[in-house]
């Protein structure tokens, strides 16, 4: 029994010299570990004479409880001391204003700036217009008749003002430009547009950039060169590009522009629906009626136009699969790209 008292005294002596949690762990292992002193004492209980065994077992358990208590107290003491040292080293002056959170540009902003920079470098000017637009500029002057489905309330946001709506594209900026300027015209029109769409790849509000060139020499080959050059600079690689015949009321002939899938490199994936191609733009030669509506003499001038969705290009550029992520105001989403 005297041996048990000596073990307790030894433990107290060791604890008095412990100065770190690492040293404490070594003491804990020595006395309470699976091969520690107290564990060995419990293993030897069967060697104790039967008349002393009960008392021996009781004393060993009391020793174990006391050891656990002493070690726990020492641990709390060391943690408190460690915290005090840390606080001393990290003293904070509460009178100093907190550091400002540093923001970063939104992927849409980055994509839009990238598009504008490329076209400025190609000699295009930037024109802007109102988001609440006259129905005449949004539809009529663009050769979109009254019976066209795009004018239905299921697709367009009309406002409580006769003859006005939330623009469905930035094409009205082209109309406004042709009404106030004489050819030659070479502009892009970036901005927000609104349509009644709401699914993983569409949003009721999104960003568009449209381009317009009007002069004496504009032709389809010229337009094709401009678009191919833009896509090459935007994606920083010489992608396969194809033009598919399409229909738009304001252009004739019209085409859809596809690029080789940037995700699977035309091997076929879910994003390109296993076709190897991704639609990125629409384009065409400006319909003569649109030019005439703006007072431009079609005997001397012709033009071409094109348009693209900024979110669509941003999703391809950054590998984003849900358009709604752009509008959730989550800084973690924004910061992962920059």
UniProtKB/Swiss-Prot annotation:
Q: What class of enzyme is it?
A: ligase
- State the UniProt keywords alphabetically: Aminoacyl-tRNA synthetase, ATP-binding, Cytoplasm, Ligase, Magnesium, Metal-binding, Nucleotide-binding, Protein biosynthesis
Provide one Gene Ontology biological process annotation.
phenylalanyl-tRNA aminoacylation
Gene Ontology molecular-function annotations: ATP binding; magnesium ion binding; phenylalanine-tRNA ligase activity; tRNA binding
Q: Where are the transmembrane segments?
A: none
Top-level taxon of the source organism: Bacteria
Q: Tell me a GO cellular component.
A: cytoplasm
Q: Which Gene3D superfamilies match?
A: Bira Bifunctional Protein, Domain 2 (3.30.930.10)
Q: Where in the cell is it found?
A: Cytoplasm
| Entry-linked Pfam families | Phe_tRNA-synt_N, tRNA-synt_2d
Cofactor annotation: Mg(2+)
* UniProt cross-references to PROSITE patterns, sorted A to Z: AA_TRNA_LIGASE_II
Give me the reactions it catalyses: tRNA(Phe) + L-phenylalanine + ATP = L-phenylalanyl-tRNA(Phe) + AMP + diphosphate + H(+)
Cofactor: how and how many bound? Binds 2 magnesium ions per tetramer.
Question: Which residues are recorded as binding Mg(2+)?
Answer: 252
Which InterPro entries does this entry report, sorted A to Z?
aa-tRNA-synth_II (IPR006195), aa-tRNA-synth_II/BPL/LPL (IPR045864), Phe-tRNA-synth_IIc_asu (IPR004529), Phe-tRNA_ligase_II_N (IPR004188), Phe_tRNA_ligase_alpha1_bac (IPR022911), Phenylalanyl-tRNA_Synthase (IPR002319), tRNA-bd_arm (IPR010978)
UniProt keyword Cytoplasm present: yes
Q: Which family does it belong to?
A: Belongs to the class-II aminoacyl-tRNA synthetase family. Phe-tRNA synthetase alpha subunit type 1 subfamily.
Spell out the subunit comment. Answer: Tetramer of two alpha and two beta subunits.
Please report the name of this protein according to its UniProt entry: Phenylalanine--tRNA ligase alpha subunit
């Amino acid at each position: 029994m005297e041996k048990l008292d000596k073990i307790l005294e030894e433990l107290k002596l060791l604890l008095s010299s412990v100065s770190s949690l690492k040293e404490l762990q070594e003491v804990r292992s020595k006395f309470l570990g699976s091969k520690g002193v107290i564990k060995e004492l419990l293993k030897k209980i069967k060697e104790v004479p039967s008349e002393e065994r009960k008392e021996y077992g009781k004393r060993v358990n009391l020793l174990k409880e006391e050891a656990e208590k002493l070690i726990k107290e020492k641990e709390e003491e060391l943690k408190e001391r460690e915290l005090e040292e840390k606080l001393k080293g990290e003293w904070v002056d509460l009178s100093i204003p907190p550091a400002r959170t540093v923001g970063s540009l939104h992927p849409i902003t980055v994509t839009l700036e990238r598009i504008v920079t490329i076209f400025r470098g190609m000699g295009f000017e930037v024109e802007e217009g109102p988001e609440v637009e006259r129905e005449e500029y949004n539809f009529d002057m663009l050769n979109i008749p009254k019976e066209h489905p795009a004018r239905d309330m299921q697709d367009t946001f009309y406002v409580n003002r006769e003859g006005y709506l939330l623009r469905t594209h930035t094409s009205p900026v082209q109309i406004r430009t042709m009404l106030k300027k004489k050819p030659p015209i070479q502009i892009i029109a970036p901005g927000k547009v609104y349509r009644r769409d709401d699914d993983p790849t569409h949003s009721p509000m999104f960003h568009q950039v449209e381009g317009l060139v009007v002069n004496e020499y504009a032709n389809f080959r010229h337009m094709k060169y401009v678009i191919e050059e833009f896509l090459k600079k935007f994606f920083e690689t010489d992608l396969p590009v194809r033009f598919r015949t399409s229909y738009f009321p304001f252009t004739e002939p019209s085409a859809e522009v596809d690029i080789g899938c940037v995700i699977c490199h035309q091997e076929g994936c879910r994003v390109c629906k296993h076709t190897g191609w991704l639609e990125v733009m629409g384009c065409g030669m400006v319909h003569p009626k649109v030019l005439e509506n703006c007072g431009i003499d079609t005997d001397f001038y012709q033009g071409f136009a094109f348009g693209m969705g900024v979110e669509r290009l941003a999703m391809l550029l950054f590998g984003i699969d849900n358009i709604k992520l752009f509008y959730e105001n989550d800084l973690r989403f924004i910061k992962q790209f920059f």
